[in-house]
Amino acid sequence: MEVGYSNTVVLRHVKQALENLLAGNVCLTEGVREIAQWRWANHGLNEALFRPFVGVDSETDSFPVGRLRELWSEDGLARADAERVAAEGRYREWILESGGIMLDAVVAALPTSTFTDPASS
């Protein structure tokens, strides 16, 4: 099932998040979270493309990433990072494959995307 219309701004955000994840610019956990947050936005993509990211986000939601890490003790971070790295190892191949498939879908959708909802015209 497709969600909403193909909004150019949303697709650009999803594309950037996918490119960052696939290039290794962010850890797998952070990349998955960035992608999963767009699942209900107007992207016009098949919602099934988001399922791997939503699932792994759910499995890794206890791990601190980004600015949240500043609030953790060194010992706590060391333990959480060891667990996170192990979890990311289990999901890496699946997520990178899913990311490539989703990026292809985003790139294909961008040329026909719009900045406004065509139904509101």
Each predicted region: which residue ranges?
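Acidic, Ser/Pro/Thr-rich low-complexity regulatory regions
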Residues: 1-121
